[in-house]
Amino acid sequence: MSLFHVLGFGVKIGHLFWMLCCWFVSWFVDNGIEDKSGLLVGSVGDLEKTKMTTLKKKNKMWFWNKISSSGLKIPSFSYQFLGSVKFNKAWWRKLVVVWVVFWVLVSIWTFWYFSSQAMEKRKETLASMCDERARMLQDQFNVSMNHVQAMSILISTFHHGKIPSAIDQRTFSEYTDRTSFERPLTSGVAYAMRVLHSEREEFERQQGWTIRKMYSLEQNPVHKDDYDLEALEPSPVQEEYAPVIFAQDTVSHVVSLDMLSGKEDRENVLRARSSGKGVLTAPFPLIKTNRLGVILTFAVYKRDLPSNATPKERIEATNGYLGGVFDIESLVENLLQQLASKQTILVNVYDITNHSQPISMYGTNVSADGLERVSPLIFGDPLRKHEMRCRFKQKPPWPVLSMVTSFGILVIALLVAHIIHATVSRIHKVEEDCDKMKQLKKKAEAADVAKSQFLATVSHEIRTPMNGVLGMLHMLMDTELDVTQQDYVRTAQASGKALVSLINEVLDQAKIESGKLELEEVRFDLRGILDDVLSLFSSKSQQKGVELAVYISDRVPDMLIGDPGRFRQILTNLMGNSIKFTEKGHIFVTVHLVDELFESIDGETASSPESTLSGLPVADRQRSWENFKAFSSNGHRSFEPSPPDINLIVSVEDTGVGIPVEAQSRIFTPFMQVGPSISRTHGGTGIGLSISKCLVGLMKGEIGFSSTPKVGSTFTFTAVFSNGMQPAERKNDNNQPIFSEFRGMKAVVVDHRPARAKVSWYHFQRLGIRVEVVPRVEQALHYLKIGTTTVNMILIEQEIWNREADDFIKKLQKDPLFLSPKLILLANSVESSISEALCTGIDPPIVIVKPLRASMLAATLQRGLGIGIREPPQHKGPPALILRNLLLGRKILIVDDNNVNLRVAAGALKKYGADVVCAESGIKAISLLKPPHEFDACFMDIQMPEMDGFEATRRIRDMEEEMNKRIKNGEALIVENGNKTSWHLPVLAMTADVIQATHEECLKCGMDGYVSKPFEAEQLYREVSRFFNSPSDTES
C-alpha cells in the first residue's frame, strides 16, 4: 500500500474526527458551560446578567454552527475566539481524553485491518501456489495416462490383431524405453494377458516359465533385498490368471507374475475390465524398490466396444490388462524441482478415498506455519479421491506496515485541519482546471476531426492523379516492351512511388506528433531498394556531373525483415539533401555491418583525397558515429547484438558545401534550416532530417553527422533488422532477374581510384561477371596480351579515357588481338561524347552513364553485346491463373468520378477476364445496383461529387434490406430475383486514402473490404478470394 493511500485514509478519518469535535463542543455550549468570569458579575442586575449570558450563548452558537456547517477550514478569528473562551478544566480534560481514546481506537482498528489484509494476501498466495502445483501434477498425470491408454490400443492392434503377433518382449521393451519421454511420470509399463485355467498349461509351455504369485502367503510386498523371482510360489489354481508377458526394462522383474494374485491388484484389474476406463490402485510399496506408488490399469479388449456395453460384455471381450506404474514420491519431487519457489512451501499429497484414514502419498511432517491450503487432485479414477495440502515453511513476518500505518495515523491526526484545508483548496482548484480542460478537450477534438478530414481530403486529391500515373505504368508493363523500355518503366514506377512516399511525409508528421507512427515487419530486398533510390536522383546527378554511387558489403544478407518504405524514406531524405547541396565531386552511399567498422574501406577516415570516390577531400567519416551510444569512448563496440538481428550502418558521403558550425547544433530540429537563404535557393520544408531521426530511433538505431564547411558532409545512421534469408535458401548476390548470358564472362576495370573501382566491381559481379581491377591502361593491355583467360570487355573510367584515349586506341589498332574485348566507357554525365574519328578502325565504346544499377547495366550490356534476350515482366503476387479463375466471367461494377482511375481499374480487372461496367457517380451506381441485378461485385470510390461512396453504399444496403424483407414476406418472387433468397453484393472501397479512420468508416457504412489504388495483384487477390471461391459460383 502506497503512502498516498495512507494519506487519503488519514484525511477521511481526520474529517470524521473534526465533525465529531464540532458536535461535542456544540453540545457543551448548549448545556451552558461557563467560564469563571461569570462569577464576577454578581453585582449586575438579573436582567443584565440574563442579557450577557444570552449574548455569549449566541456568539458561541454562531461560531460552532459555522464550523460544523463547513467542516472544512478554520479561519484565523476562530482560533482567537477559541482562545478567548474559558472552558472548565474538567471538561477540557475530558475532551482531551476523548481525543486520545478515539485515535487509539482508530489506530487499533487500523492495525487489525492491515494485519487481516496481509493475512488474506498470504492465504491467496498460498492458494495460488498450491493450485498451480496441483494443476501441473494433474495435467502431467493426464498426459501420461493418455499415452498409457494409447499403448493399450497398440497392444490390441499389433499383438492380438496380428497372427503371428508383431510384438514380443524385446520389441515392447525397446518401444517403451524409446517413448518414455511421452510418459514422464511413469516409472514403467507392463502388459498382463488374460489366461483361463484351461489354457494355463499350454500358456506356460509357450512362454517357458511358470505363472507365479505376486505376494507371499501373508500378502506382504517383497522387500527389494529379498526379492527373488525363482523363490516366488506358483500362482494357485483359480478360474483365470493375468500373468505379465511384456514389461519395460525398469519393471522387467514383474514378468510371469500373476496380477490377480494380489488383493489390491486383483480389485484394480477386475474394476478396469468391467468399467472400460483407467483405474488406480491405492498407494502401496512397489515391488523391489519398496517406494510408495500406484498402478494405473487399462483393459485391452478383443474389439471396439460401444460406450454403453455391459460389464458382462466387457469381461467376455477382455484380452489382457495394461498397467502403468507411477512412483508418486519421484514424480512429485521432479515436479517441485521445476518451480523456482519450491522451497517456499511444504507439499503433501494424500489419498482420501477413505476420509477417516487418509493415506500419505508424499510429504513430511515438518513443523511449519499453521495456515494450510487443500487443492483437489483428479487423476481420472472417479472412485479414488486425492488432494494436495500446502503450508508455508516460514512463519509470517512482523506486520511492519500495520504498525507504521497505525502510528502514522496518530501523527496525521495532529495535522488534520491543515490537510483538510489544503485538500479542499486543491480540490476546488482541480475542479476549476478540470472544467477548463473539458472545454479545451472539446475544442481539441473538434480541431482533430477537422484536421483528419482535411488530411483525408488533401491526401485523396493529391493521390488520385498520381495513382493514375502509376496505374498506367503498371498497365504499360503488361505490353510488349524490350529490356530498355522495361527499365525506363520501372524507373518511372519507382520515381512515382517515391513521390507518393514524399507526399506521405505530410501525413507522417501528424502521426509523429501523436506518437502513433509504427513500423512494418516485411521481407524486402535491400539492394533493390538502393537501386530504386539511385533511380530517383540519377537524372539530376547526371545533369550536374556529380558521381553518384552505392556500395553494399557482400556480408550484408540479400533479404532483410523490416520496414522497407521507412528505410527508403530515410535514404531519400539524406541523398536528397546531398544532391541538393553538391555541385561537384561525388555522393557515395555505403552499407556495411557494424562489425566491419574498423575494416578496410568503411574503417578509413578518408583523410587522403586519393582514397575517395572522386579524388576530392571529404569530411571525417568516423566523427559521424563517434557519439553513438552503441559504442564506447574509444570507438569500439560496447554491445553484442543478438544473433538473429542484422545491425547495419549506412553512410551518405558528399562533397557539397558543408554545414556551417553555428548551424550544426539545430540540424535535426523540425522546420529549421541552415539559413534563411537556403529555402529560397534550394527549397525544402526542413522536416526531412527530423523525420529521419524519428524513423532511425524506431529502428533501434542512431544517426549522426560530420561536416566541414566547403568540404562536404557525411551522415551515418544505424538500423537493426532481422535476417530474411530462409535456412535452405542459397545466397544470391544478384537480386535482379538472372541473366544467364553474363555468367562466365570476364571484365577488366581500368581505374586508379580504389573506392571507385570497388563500386564498379560490386555492380558487375552482381550480374555474374568476374572483374579484374588495374590502375592503368598499359596494365590492361598487358593483361590481354598474356591471354591466360578470355576477356569479354574492358571498362574504362571517363577520367582515364580523356587522358589516355589517343595512345590506347593506337595500340588497339596495331594489334588485332586487342580488338576482341568490347570497350565500355563509364561516364558521369549524359553529355559525354566520343570522337568517331578517334575510334576509326575499332568499334566505338559503349557509354554507360552513372549511377550504376543492375537493371540498367544488364539492359545496356545486352544491347551493346548483342546477346539480349527480352524476358517477360516479372509480376509479383499470386499467379495470374488464380486471379483469372476467380474473376473470369464475373460482372463487376466500378464507380469512380475520375476517368483515368476508371480506365486503370477496368484494365486491371479485364486482364483477368472480368466483365466490367463503369459508373461515373454514386447516383448512377445506385440505379444500376437496384435489385434485381446481375452484378457479382462493386468497387466503389469513396470521395465523389454529389454523393460519396459512403452514402451510396448505405443506400445500396437499404435497397437490399428492403428486397430481402419482401422476399421473406412473400411479396417478391424468388424466380424474379434470379433465384436468390438473400441479397448482399460485395462492395469494396477503392480509394487512395490510407488513413485508418477512413478504413473504419468504410466498414461502418456497410462496405465489405478495402482496396487501395492502384490495384496490386496480391491485395486484389486477398480481397476477392473472400467472396469468389471458384468459377462455379458464377454459374450458380
Swiss-Prot record:
Keywords annotated in UniProt: Cell membrane, Cytokinin signaling pathway, Developmental protein, Endoplasmic reticulum, Kinase, Membrane, Phosphoprotein, Repeat, Transferase, Transmembrane, Transmembrane helix
Effect on the protein upon substituting residue 713 to F: In ahk3-4; reduced sensitivity to cytokinin (mostly in roots), and impaired cytokinin repression of several Pi starvation-responsive genes and increased sucrose sensitivity
Modification sites for 4-aspartylphosphate: 941
Extracellular-facing ranges: 1-8, 116-399
Annotated membrane topology: Multi-pass membrane protein
Compartment(s) where it occurs, according to its Swiss-Prot or TrEMBL record: Cell membrane; Endoplasmic reticulum membrane
pH dependence: Optimum pH to bind cytokinin is about 8.5 at 0 degrees Celsius.
Transmembrane segments: 9-29, 95-115, 400-420
Chain ranges of the CHASE domain: 163-389
Deletion phenotype: Hypersensitivity to ABA, and strong drought and salinity tolerance. Reduced sensitivity to cytokinin (mostly in roots). More rapid germination, reduced requirement for light, and decreased far-red light sensitivity. Early senescence promoted by darkness. Reduced sensitivity to N-isobutyl decanamide. Defects in procambium proliferation and absence of secondary growth. Enhanced freezing tolerance. Impaired benzyladenine (6-BA)-mediated repression of the iron uptake pathway. Disturbed cytokinin-mediated flower development abnormality. Impaired meristematic development in seedlings.
GO molecular function terms listed in the Swiss-Prot or TrEMBL record: cytokinin receptor activity; phosphorelay sensor kinase activity; protein histidine kinase activity; protein histidine kinase binding
Catalytic activity: ATP + protein L-histidine = ADP + protein N-phospho-L-histidine
Subunit structure: Interacts with AHK2, AHK4, AHP1, AHP2, AHP3, AHP5 and At5g43560.
General remark: 'Oresara' means 'long living' in Korean.
Protein name: Histidine kinase 3
